[in-house]
């Protein structure tokens, strides 16, 4: 299992466009990937799950992956978070 903590700096938080990009990135991997926020965990491959969290600016989230490609998944998601200016 691999995980990484992120502090969301984007003014709009994880809104529709970056959420879609995160879901697309996560969906490339076979591992189970979750986004944890305020004690609630959702499947990062589910746009509805990600949007339901309402992650805003200043939030601390953890992304965890479990499976054969977990480490690669975390690296790719971290790159997406940085590229999109989320964290």
UniProtKB/Swiss-Prot annotation:
Domain HPr: 1-87
Domain of life: Bacteria
Keywords of the record: Cytoplasm, Phosphoprotein, Phosphotransferase system, Sugar transport, Transcription, Transcription regulation, Transport
One Pfam family hit: PTS-HPr
Activity regulation (UniProt): Phosphorylation on Ser-46 inhibits the phosphoryl transfer from enzyme I to HPr.
Main location: cytoplasm
Location(s), subcellular: Cytoplasm
Phosphoserine modification, residue list: 46
GO process annotations (BP): phosphoenolpyruvate-dependent sugar phosphotransferase system
Entry GO CC: cytoplasm
TM annotation in the entry: none
Coiled-coil parts of chain: none
Active site per UniProt: 15 (pros-phosphohistidine intermediate)
Family of the protein in this entry: Belongs to the HPr family.
Job of this protein: General (non sugar-specific) component of the phosphoenolpyruvate-dependent sugar phosphotransferase system (sugar PTS). This major carbohydrate active-transport system catalyzes the phosphorylation of incoming sugar substrates concomitantly with their translocation across the cell membrane. The phosphoryl group from phosphoenolpyruvate (PEP) is transferred to the phosphoryl carrier protein HPr by enzyme I. Phospho-HPr then transfers it to the PTS EIIA domain. P-Ser-HPr interacts with the catabolite control protein A (CcpA), forming a complex that binds to DNA at the catabolite response elements cre, operator sites preceding a large number of catabolite-regulated genes. Thus, P-Ser-HPr is a corepressor in carbon catabolite repression (CCR), a mechanism that allows bacteria to coordinate and optimize the utilization of available carbon sources. P-Ser-HPr also plays a role in inducer exclusion, in which it probably interacts with several non-PTS permeases and inhibits their transport activity.
Protein name: Phosphocarrier protein HPr
């Amino acid at each position: 299992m691999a995980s990484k903590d992120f502090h969301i700096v984007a003014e709009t938080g994880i809104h529709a466009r970056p959420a879609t990009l995160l879901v697309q990135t996560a969906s490339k991997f076979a591992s189970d990937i979750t986004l944890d926020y305020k004690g609630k965990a959702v499947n990062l491959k589910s746009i509805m799950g990600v949007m339901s969290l309402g992650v805003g600016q200043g939030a601390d989230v953890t992304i965890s992956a479990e499976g054969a490609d977990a480490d690669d998944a975390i690296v790719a998601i971290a790159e997406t978070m940085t590229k999109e200016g989320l964290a």
